[in-house]
Amino acid sequence: MSHLLLIDDDLELCDLLSRWLSQEGFVVAASHDGQQARQQLQANSPDAVILDVMLPDGSGLELLKQLRQEHPELPVLMLSARGEPLDRILGLELGADDYLAKPCDPRELTARLRAVLRRSQATGKPQLQDLGDLSFSAARGTVSIGEHEASLTLSEGRILEALLQTPGEPVDKQALAQLALGRKLSLYDRSLDMHVSNLRKKLGPHADGRPRIQALRGRGYLYQP
C-alpha cells in the first residue's frame, strides 16, 4: 500500500482527494502549508508527494527545490490552479515528475500517481551502467562523470537509463515518454523536453564540447558515446 503526502492549503480539495485516493487504496496524509509538510517529511517517508504551487507560507516551487535537494528520487506531482505555462515550466525545471492543472479529474490524478509509482518501484534495473567516462547507478539515482557526481530525479534517471541502453541510436520521444513518464505525450506537451533539458545540465558536454544528449528532429533523442 503506497503512502502519499498531499500538500495543499485548500482544505475542501484536500478532503475530497484524500477520500478519493483512500478509496483507491492509498494511505494519505495531508499538510496545508510548507512548515507542516517539512515536519511530515521528517517524521514519515512517503512514497510520493502531491504538491500545490501556491502555499500560504511560501511557494510550493521553493519547497519542491528543497525536496529535490534532500530527496532527489522521491516522486513529486505538482498541482496548480493558476494554469500559467510558466508555473508548469518552472515546476518541471525544478524536478517535478509530473504536473496537473486544477481543477483536475481525480481519476487522471490517480492514473498519473500510479504511473510514477510504478516507475519508482520498478525492479530488475541494472545496478550500474558505464559508458566512457560516465557511470550511472540506477539503484542510487546518481550519475558520475570523472570526479563529479549528480543526483537525478526519477524521471531523469529513467530517461538516462533508456538512452544508455542504445548509445548512438535515437529513442523515439513517445517511447521515451512512456518509459520515463509512464504515459504518452499529448499535443504541445513539453514535459519530456524539460526533463531532458534538466538532465543535459547535470551531465554537461563531453570533454571535446559535444553534447552528451542530442535531439534529432522527428526521431527523438540519443546519447552520444
Residue ranges and their predicted role:
Residues 8, 32, 55:
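Conserved acidic carboxylate
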Residues 123-128, 151, 194-225:
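DNA-binding patch around the recognition helix
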Residues 45-47, 71-75, 186:
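His-Asp phosphorelay/catalytic-motif detector in bacterial-type signaling
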Residues 44-50, 55:
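Active-site beta3 strand of CheY-like receiver
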Residues 2-3, 114-174:
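Short, Lys/Arg-enriched segments at the junction into DNA-binding effector domains
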Residues 25-34, 40:
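Short hydrophobic/Thr-rich beta-strand motif most characteristic of the beta2 strand and flanking loop
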Residues 59, 65-130:
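Basic, amphipathic DNA-recognition helix from helix-turn-helix-like DNA-binding domains
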Residues 12-23:
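Charged docking surfaces used in two-component/phosphorelay signaling
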